[in-house]
Amino acid sequence: MVDDPPTDVILYVRGALFDMDGVLVDSTASDERCWLRWAQLHGMEGSFSIHSPHGRRAVDTVRALRPDLDPYVELRRLEDFDAEDPSGTSALSGAAALLAALPTRSWVIVTSAPARLAKTRLQFAGITVPHNLVSVDDVSRGKPDPEPYELGARKLGLEPSECLVIEDSPAGIKAGKAAGCKTLAVYPRTRSIRWWRPIGSFHR
């Protein structure tokens, strides 16, 4: 049973570590299009679930689904699919304004996407590419391993315990908590996790 979230929560932190897809940017349509196109290419459309890749590195998903393929070749293919047609990608309401209101060096985007893809999606969604970005290219182990969020904290010159992670996927939430960060889940997909709070926009 999931505990009801408290009505008001005050967290004292010095830095914010934002996941990208599903938190700042809604890339669901683009993601589905790319993964389904990839699944069709490899004759997997009948057995593929679009929910399985969410929050994890594409190379890890490819390894799990098709260990016979070179995951880095397939990663590049997926990037190309997305670059060809990023339509449907948009910023979550209020996300750009929130980021603009924060001191530039007080926050980091920590994403399971490659840097090239992350920048494409942010630009298409109208969000300025940040000074600090941790992508899959920067780590040897992706979420749910804590390495991405540990690196995000280091980029701010902070301890993980001084940072708030904002996440929407179970893998990302586990990564934030394992890193020792305060961790906030912001999407109903995570109702199986004990910490969650639904959010439709960043205006409140």
Segment roles from a protein language model:
Residues 105-107, 181:
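Short phosphate-binding/catalytic loops that engage adenosine nucleotides
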Residues 36-39, 108, 196-197:
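Short linear interaction motif-like sites in intrinsically disordered regions of transcription factors
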Residues 24, 51, 107-110, 141, ...:
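Conserved SAM-binding loop
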Residues 1-14, 96, 100, 115-204:
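Asp-based, Mg2+/Mn2+-dependent phosphohydrolase catalytic module
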Residues 4-103, 114-116, 127:
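N-terminal helical cap/lid subdomain that shapes the substrate entry/recognition surface
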